[in-house]
Amino acid sequence: MEFRTVVDVPDPGFRIGPCADLLFVGSCFADSIGCRFQEEKFRVTVNPFGVMYNPASILHTVERLSAQQLSPAVTFLTLGTNHVYRLKETGEIVDNCQKRPQTLFIEEELSVDDCADYLEQTIELLRQMNPDVQVVLTVSPIRYRKYGYHGSQLSKATLLLAADKVCGSNPAVCYFPAYEIVNDELRDYRFYQADMLHPSDQTVEYIWQRLTETWLSEEALVFLKEWAPLKAVLNHKPFHPDSKEYQALMDKTMLKVQELQKKYPNFAL
């Protein structure tokens, strides 16, 4: 008997190669998945100007990045909320209130069309950076207690509808169901951290596995297998780092690292 529903992960129509250039922008969930790719030596940029929760702030990050020589092969945009804060004095949406008095800001909720428009602008900028970029939209599974749980669900629904609208009109944009995997497939508090809001490390690892088993190229999967034993040695903290045995192990490991660098030009420690 099957006691859980397994969420289908769609084929994106492309594959992520070994040590590919990736960009992650969005909520703290983007940090979690982006850092997981970093561990596996993909060339990753993660929220370079801090965590961005809403589509407008995600656009602001990409606007700043567009002036830099960055050309990601794949960009993940992780949507956290449709709530934004406008500075009363100027009307601009701010990315961070920077602990300024709350009276200086007006909180608003972006509509589905607002969110979709900000995402479309972001995608256009990304295509200027790399015409062949693949864009992945995902909605963070992290709930927002401060909105109330019903309000949090309404916010997520707005983001889901906006993501669906954008994916439907852009062939090179696809959706990864992280929100659905956590809330429909796992749906158990043992998969959350102590605050009962943020996914646990185990959950992040599960989502990473679901993503990589479908979205990585065969070459990238081979690379992960070759890199895994070397990563284990390099991450190990020896009891006797000055011993001849450990030095011999490190010499052998570094030779294998050099072999990987020859095989995969983008690979770097």
Model-inferred region functions:
Residues 1-269:
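Extracellular glycan-modifying ectodomains
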